[in-house]
């Protein structure tokens, strides 16, 4: 079997056959990496279940390495109201963070492949479209293109080379290590592909008790922030903060201001 197994990765990847300390549905961390593929720059966001006794930095560095990427901060991220979004930001020079993706027109159609999914997750994915699309002052919209049989083309675990196919697909893959999911994106030729790890235990209803299960809508909500063009935020009142220990089922006001500033 090829090393690029039938799998789907969009800046999210996890593994059930990992240390029990990483299966508690607890501390989750996220980081962005960069990879060169045939002269093209690809970025990937990894979402990782951090094992007990390990730092978030070490866990995310390992996950990035498994994706063939190295830690990188997009050069356009940061700055008061800045990044690729421009504009003046919020009151008092509030700082926003962007990853270089900016859609023109500001619309994204996302397709879902549920093959090998351990739970019914499409409804949770669609729920996040309402969050990111219905922000006062923002023209950004993301919607469902229905289902697909495609493996997201930018995902490392998919068959063949990592290439742009001008589609934004979401799927599932057997990702390694402690990765819950990945989102790969290319600002130069706007595209974003996502995959979650089939090997973890998930729950589909955000905010409900799930024991050791990880909340799939929380991961989709964070990753679709990256799809919209947002980078990790430096404040905890944001779904884009790169660490959390409890489900996040809706945007914070800061997230709404961030995307309204970009679009």
Listing of model-derived features with the role each one plays in the protein:
Residues 1-9:
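Bacterial N-terminal signal peptides that target proteins for export
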Residues 9-19:
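Bacterial N-terminal signal peptides
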Residues 23-263:
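Zinc-dependent metalloendopeptidases
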